[in-house]
Amino acid sequence: MEDNSVLNEDSNLEHVEGQPRRSMSQPVLNVEGDKRTSSTSATQQQVLSGAFSSADVRSIPIIQTWEENKALKTKITILRGELQMYQRRYSEAKEASQKRVKEVMDDYVDLKLGQENVQEKMEQYKLMEEDLLAMQSRIETSEDNFARQMKEFEAQKHAMEERIKELELSATDANNTTVGSFRGTLDDILKKNDPDFTLTSGYEERKINDLEAKLLSEIDKVAELEDHIQQLRQELDDQSARLADSENVRAQLEAATGQGILGAAGNAMVPNSTFMIGNGRESQTRDQLNYIDDLETKLADAKKENDKARQALVEYMNKCSKLEHEIRTMVKNSTFDSSSMLLGGQTSDELKIQIGKVNGELNVLRAENRELRIRCDQLTGGDGNLSISLGQSRLMAGIATNDVDSIGQGNETGGTSMRILPRESQLDDLEESKLPLMDTSSAVRNQQQFASMWEDFESVKDSLQNNHNDTLEGSFNSSMPPPGRDATQSFLSQKSFKNSPIVMQKPKSLHLHLKSHQSEGAGEQIQNNSFSTKTASPHVSQSHIPILHDMQQILDSSAMFLEGQHDVAVNVEQMQEKMSQIREALARLFERLKSSAALFEEILERMGSSDPNADKIKKMKLAFETSINDKLNVSAILEAAEKDLHNMSLNFSILEKSIVSQAAEASRRFTIAPDAEDVASSSLLNASYSPLFKFTSNSDIVEKLQNEVSELKNELEMARTRDMRSPLNGSSGRLSDVQINTNRMFEDLEVSEATLQKAKEENSTLKSQFAELEANLHQVNSKLGEVRCELNEALARVDGEQETRVKAENALEEARQLISSLKHEENELKKTITDMGMRLNEAKKSDEFLKSELSTALEEEKKSQNLADELSEELNGWRMRTKEAENKVEHASSEKSEMLERIVHLETEMEKLSTSEIAADYCSTKMTERKKEIELAKYREDFENAAIVGLERISKEISELTKKTLKAKIIPSNISSIQLVCDELCRRLSREREQQHEYAKVMRDVNEKIEKLQLEKDALEHELKMMSSNNENVPPVGTSVSGMPTKTSNQKCAQPHYTSPTRQLLHESTMAVDAIVQKLKKTHNMSGMGPELKETIGNVINESRVLRDFLHQKLILFKGIDMSNWKNETVDQLITDLGQLHQDNLMLEEQIKKYKKELKLTKSAIPTLGVEFQDRIKTEIGKIATDMGGAVKEIRKK
């Protein structure tokens, strides 16, 4: 059940308030008034019914005047409500216009920041573009150098090969004299020490010669490579110097175009042209030139837009300076006297306060303008120092440079001193700029409001100076002093009455003032701020003292009633705030219910329709949906309650204002006096409630009232005679009673005259008040027309601002698109840079590889030089020795050379044979491996085909056996399909095996039962034969007739009855279900079970118990059957019944299997459901509890 106590509390508010109000134009002003209206209706009914009391007859005109006064009061309240409504609309329109201006300014600042970001990104893009161009040029130069180096390396290689050949030719001796003698000497020397020496040293000598040639060639290569490296370094230095020069020239050209130095040259040049610096034909292509031209056009467009934005800023700041100049002149010229005139419910002090607020707002705007000027100066290229820029630039054309410090001090301290030096030429320039970048409607509206109020003040002042008073000798001064403190406080109800309650000061008792004035004497003058000092204050007459006392009581009671009414209004506002809190809390709760409903839907989908908890969850879902639908009704009720509370607060405010105005009107009546006492009483009343009005003579009013009283007397006499004619004609005996009544009526007439006079006075005052309110309403309507004009102008300005905003948004979108395109291009450039970096890395790797080769060559060169030195030393020694042995070796040199040639030829042939043998071995191994792979592939294909054929045959046989086609099909190239088919076949085979096992059990049971039945049949046949044999031995008829039936009955009782298989089946089924129940109980009591699983097992236990009870009841019913009347059927009939029962048993077994499968599914689904959703359900319940607790805390705060 939901707790609707809060809603019941809200619904009881109507009973507390009383009768419902029909409209805002009929406020319930007073509970006593309702009693009076009821009393007046009752008196009218008594008059109509014939109860002719003298008091009721004489009170009829008073009632009419009271009703007229009531109607006038209702009209006054209606007019005041309309006035408040129009004031509220004006304030709302003013706030809306100010909000729009702020939004436009925020958008403008965002645009400026976005423009700065775009400029920064454009500069970054330019730098990246320059870096990219430099990298491209470097990469191209490096690629060219690399290609040239490769060509040079190839040429050097070719030259080295030719030189090696030439050296080999030059090194070989045709006659072989030196080499032969050298070899002979070596052989001889070695042969002395080694007797087994053979002529094989010529091959080693050839190796030495080859090494020497290679050493010389490597030395030459190293020298050439060093020369080439020096040349490449020189070229790289020259190219880097050229690139640095070209980048400096380009930067200078761009700086010149940005500063406008090359304006004339740029106009003369062709647009979309590109500067060609250096050797452009080698480093740049046509695509790069077109790309650079597009970038230059975009840069030119961005510069144009930047110039437009700067011009717009300049025009905007010019307009701001012009407005400040006008406001300064207005403030300087607006010198007015502190008078006590009431202009639209505001005194001069209040006007000064409002002007101070306007000046404060202007100071804030001035500070913002100063910040904007600094920002503009920075955007235009300045340093942001206003001391220099404000005096030189045309943005602050109206402010002198000497006054900047005073401006800053005024802005810091909140002062209003800023000297503006207007110049005619600069004002003309300011009038030419017409770009509305900032909405100045608030300042203009304040200016217009101040001007209209100043005109009203001057007009009222002139009218008061021209108007001459008839009764008083003096007149008001041109500059009136301000009113008293109490008067201003009593009429501050029109200024924010709801937020700040009025402190009603209790006025002094009037009789004390009268006594003090009587004791002072006639020569003293009453010091009152509301009168001029020329008029003397007369004394108070004794006849007006009770009226003054009544007036004092009325004012005191109205003050007390105001305090209570204000407390009630505060309570209503608190209730309204609490209603909003209740509404927010209910919204949060309903949203939480939505999320919990979604959670229950997921649980229902997971559990399925077979679960017993599904129906409960569906019911909960329906309950959630109904509660969510009820949310709309509850929210509507809360909205209506909030509206009613808002209307109550408005009615309370209207009531307070009406009471204050009545108190003011009551005090006003006593300021109009014809004699000295009234003047004195008015001076006393003005001490506490004195609104300042114009004095007029009161004698004409008194005469009019006396005439009205005489007319009312005549009307009363005529009505009395007219009403009393009918009873006098009918009954002459009542004349004495009528005379008594007339005497009483004449006695009461004097009393009614005083009340009538008071009512007439009230009527006259109300009429005058109504006329004044109508005049005020006329003024308000005129002001409303002006306000509407201002609003239309503000709307037009707002439309213009919206258009500018739309333009700015379009510009922003274009800038964003430009930025996105630039980002895309930047990404492409980054990709190209990464590609170039990869190429550079490859080139660096190749350079490093070459350097490593050079280093290895240098190391080998050093080693070869060392070896050459050692060999040269050894050769010198050997040459000395060989000279001695040359003669001995000459004759054997020819033989040695031939043998050496043969050996070399044989070695080459051996090498060729070894390589051919290695290749043959490799090919043979490859061939064997390939043959094995082919055989394996064939074996696999045959095996797969045989397996697929076998699987197809097995699947066909199984489908024929089960009479069901397989869902999965075999795809030869897909292993997963074969696995699926195998799984399905296994499943089918396991199923068939289980069914065959079950069939075997059933057939075994059937065979056993058939055997039992056959045995029983044999027994029955034997018994029948025995009975037939006994019947043959029956005694004749007539003898022992009475004893025969006893024997037959005993025989029947002795025969065994037929045991029904249905009874046995019921017994076995009940026992089986009981065993299931016991097993489920054991599983239910096991430890480690989840709560949801326990619930499901409990439900299954209950259902199985119901099934057990049902079977047990059927068994009891079957036991109650009389077995004596059981029909002994034949064996064939029993077999057919057994077959039917067997079929029924199979159907029941299938159903039990289905139930078991569903139970397994629920068991498998419920634990996963609990594991997945347990935490979510806990968190959901916790969130609901926290939301409800938070809502209750918020509601109980106040």
Swiss-Prot record:
Principal cellular location given in the protein's record: cytoplasm
GO cellular component: centrosome; cytoplasm; protein phosphatase type 2A complex
The protein's role, per its UniProt record: Plays a central role in centrosome maturation and mitotic spindle assembly during the first division of the zygote. Required for the centrosomal localization of air-1 and zyg-9. Probably not required in late embryogenesis and during larval development.
Lineage start: Eukaryota, Metazoa, Ecdysozoa, Nematoda, Chromadorea
Record keyword Ligase present: no
Record's compositionally biased regions (Polar residues): 1-10
Coiled-coil ranges from the UniProt annotation: 67-381, 566-603, 694-916, 983-1035, 1127-1175
Localisation per UniProt entry: Cytoplasm, Cytoskeleton, Microtubule organizing center, Centrosome
Single GO MF descriptor: molecular condensate scaffold activity
Gene Ontology biological-process annotations: centrosome cycle; mitotic spindle organization; positive regulation of mitotic cell cycle, embryonic; protein localization; protein localization to organelle
Entry keywords, A to Z: Cell cycle, Coiled coil, Cytoplasm, Cytoskeleton, Developmental protein
Keyword Coiled coil (UniProt): yes
Superkingdom of origin organism: Eukaryota
Annotated gene: spd-5
Name by which UniProt lists this protein: Spindle-defective protein 5
Chain spans, region Disordered: 1-45
